[in-house]
Amino acid sequence: IVLETNDKCIIQNIQHVELFEGNIYILDDKSRTLCVFNMNGTFLYRIGDIGNGKGEHIELSDFAIDRKDKKIYLWDEATDKANVFDIDTKDYIYSIKTEREGSRSYYILYHNNKLYTNHTLLNNDDETHLLREIDCETGKQIATYLNCEEYNKGWNFPLRMANSCFYSQNTTSPKYVDIFGDTILSILPDRLIPAYVVES
């Protein structure tokens, strides 16, 4: 598919792509914009704008789609906030502000009415988890998972990868693996379980 190019949709570096209801959603890492195209490659519209106002973002780093309720979550890594939009109307609905508390998140996953973010530390403290579960309405942290010593060779410092640590996002069991991890985990409705282990 050849994508249309104009002043509103210059794609320079693709960070994340999703297909939903006949449209292609592309997050461009350079312009920090989410562009939507149809399956012929025709540009349709953008979701979200750069700024400090309601529904605006500073550093858009990821997005996730709630396919049941037709919502899209745009993750702003600069503020640890998700702006939520209605996919059909493109209207801004609300924002979910999480509690940063010395950490930074770059990637999100929406799965089974739950929102997950990766978790890296801006300072040294006692928190060593790599993944957190966030309430989709309040932004409160519900649970944490995966000790960095066991699942990422002890590494838990801010480092934004070229691609998300979430894979197979639109399946019944999405996968998670961190940059130095040797275990690929399946995210189930009630727990995380190892799916594959790489021996090295």
Task: Specify the residue positions occupied by each region the protein language model found.
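Eukaryotic scaffold repeat domains enriched in small/polar residues
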Residues: 1-200
